[in-house]
């Protein structure tokens, strides 16, 4: 029997392992020089003005919303077709998530869908770049400017993505994820980027106990060990062990993303004619980084549902993923918003299936997945 093919696997090589060993030998393994280097390299690569490394994108969303003063009585517009962490953070802050539907084929929202949901209580919009493609940002930013509303881009899927002529993160405020399955990984980690210095400074303070400095700063700059708390904060800093991995991955990112694109081209060629429906590619100029490759499994066309297809692939030694079950269909939110209806989100949520895609895959692996799909569907 062939080896099991997972839907994702991190592309970790000798350079990443060597970088970790160097940090372990350095005597400084928590937040330190590698963090500062990563933040600077991220800015240099993508044209960001300010970057703050964090232990996760979820942590980044938490402290960013806090820094913007989001709290009870406020509304935050965001898609339900996303990972639940954003919705959880909004809810935990006492604010109200206002769910917006998405385009049925790109799974991204739009200014046209957002506009009717804006009220006097709307304080932020969180559009989601999806699966490696950029949301159509300019109309959303223009809408937000007219109403004086903050925009926080959920760029967890979009490291290395371009929208029109600019990198995601080059302007405005965006949050990236370095989770284990992401295009750039350090096991766990994230990055806030922004062109708002005051926001960056506040996030930097909130991410480390409200001190505004980390342990390395206090030692290297000769500050007193008893740095003062300016405001209550959290411990959301990234260790240098993780930052060292991220630095290597950042240097490799063009190569890793190019391999993903090559694999997707093979999928697109071989899946043509099958009753599966891949996500549509946006029509505006962009560079897609193919974080995920998803198809929709419509029982009326395929003769079986998504869960049955996933089980059949599992039995053939092929892993799949689900990105994502819509947040408002989860138990807590389903009970809190029993009358909420998002037709495009709900149709896709019950049909989405993520096929294997990672840089260490081969074209033969893609052919194996497609052969299994043909066998199952025919």
Curated annotation (Swiss-Prot):
The modification N6-(pyridoxal phosphate)lysine is found at residue 182. Pathway: Nucleotide-sugar biosynthesis; UDP-4-deoxy-4-formamido-beta-L-arabinose biosynthesis; UDP-4-deoxy-4-formamido-beta-L-arabinose from UDP-alpha-D-glucuronate: step 2/3; Bacterial outer membrane biogenesis; lipopolysaccharide biosynthesis. One of its GO terms (biological process) is lipid A biosynthetic process. CDD domains: AHBA_syn (cd00616). It is an enzyme of class 2 (transferase). GO terms for molecular function: pyridoxal phosphate binding; UDP-4-amino-4-deoxy-L-arabinose aminotransferase. Signal peptide: none annotated. It comes from the Bacteria. Its EC number is 2.6.1.87. One of its GO terms (cellular component) is membrane. Keywords: Aminotransferase, Antibiotic resistance, Lipid A biosynthesis, Lipid biosynthesis, Lipid metabolism, Lipopolysaccharide biosynthesis, Pyridoxal phosphate, Transferase. Its cofactor is pyridoxal 5'-phosphate. Gene3D superfamilies: Aspartate Aminotransferase, domain 1 (3.90.1150.10), Type I PLP-dependent aspartate aminotransferase-like (Major domain) (3.40.640.10). It catalyses: UDP-4-amino-4-deoxy-beta-L-arabinose + 2-oxoglutarate = UDP-beta-L-threo-pentopyranos-4-ulose + L-glutamate. PANTHER family: TRANSAMINASE (PTHR30244), UDP-4-AMINO-4-DEOXY-L-ARABINOSE--OXOGLUTARATE AMINOTRANSFERASE (PTHR30244:SF41). NCBIfam families: PRK11658.1 (NF008658). Belongs to the DegT/DnrJ/EryC1 family. ArnB subfamily. Catalyzes the conversion of UDP-4-keto-arabinose (UDP-Ara4O) to UDP-4-amino-4-deoxy-L-arabinose (UDP-L-Ara4N). The modified arabinose is attached to lipid A and is required for resistance to polymyxin and cationic antimicrobial peptides. Homodimer. This is UDP-4-amino-4-deoxy-L-arabinose--oxoglutarate aminotransferase. It comes from Aeromonas hydrophila subsp. hydrophila (strain ATCC 7966 / DSM 30187 / BCRC 13018 / CCUG 14551 / JCM 1027 / KCTC 2358 / NCIMB 9240 / NCTC 8049). The gene is arnB.
